[in-house]
C-alpha cells in the first residue's frame, strides 16, 4: 500500500486525493491536519530526509509526499502511479 501525506486545503493534495478516493486498498491518504500524530510523522520525514531540501529552501511545505511500497519516499505523483496536477 502506498501512503500519501497531504492536506485538504492543498490544491495539489486535493487533486491526488480525487484520484485515489475510490481505489480501495492501493493507497492510504494521511491528512496531516487531522491529528497532531499525523503532523509529527510528516515533520519527522521532512526534517530528516534530503528529498525535502529544495522544498524547505523554497518555502514550500513538501506535500503531497508519497511513501511507496518499497519504503522509498517521493514527491513525484508519477512514482505512485498517479498524475501530477497541470498548472495553467
Spans of features found by a protein language model:
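Short glycine-/acidic-enriched loop or helix-start segments at secondary-structure transitions
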Residues: 14-16, 39, 76-78
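Short, glycine/charged-enriched secondary-structure capping and boundary segments
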Residues: 18-20, 44, 80-82
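Short, low-complexity, polar/charged sequence segments that are solvent-exposed and flexible
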Residues: 23-24, 46-51, 85-86
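Local sequence-structure signature of Cys/Sec-based thiol-disulfide redox active-site neighborhoods
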Residues: 1-32
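Surface-exposed, flexible loop/turn segments at secondary-structure boundaries
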Residues: 10, 35, 74
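Short, structured active-site "lid" loops
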Residues: 43-73
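Thiol-based oxidoreductase modules, predominantly thioredoxin-like and allied folds used
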Residues: 26-48
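Non-catalytic, surface beta->alpha helical segment in thiol-disulfide oxidoreductase systems
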Residues: 67-88
Amino acid at each position: 500500500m502506498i501512503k500519501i501525506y497531504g492536506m485538504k486545503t492543498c490544491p495539489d493534495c486535493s487533486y491526488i486525493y480525487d484520484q485515489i478516493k475510490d481505489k480501495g486498498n492501493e493507497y492510504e491518504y494521511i491528512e496531516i491536519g487531522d491529528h497532531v500524530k499525523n503532523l509529527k510523522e510528516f515533520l519527522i520525514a521532512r526534517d530528516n530526509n534530503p528529498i525535502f531540501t529544495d522544498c524547505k529552501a523554497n518555502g514550500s511545505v513538501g506535500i503531497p509526499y508519497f511513501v511507496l511500497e518499497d519504503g522509498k519516499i517521493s514527491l513525484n505523483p508519477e512514482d505512485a502511479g498517479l498524475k501530477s496536477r497541470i498548472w495553467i
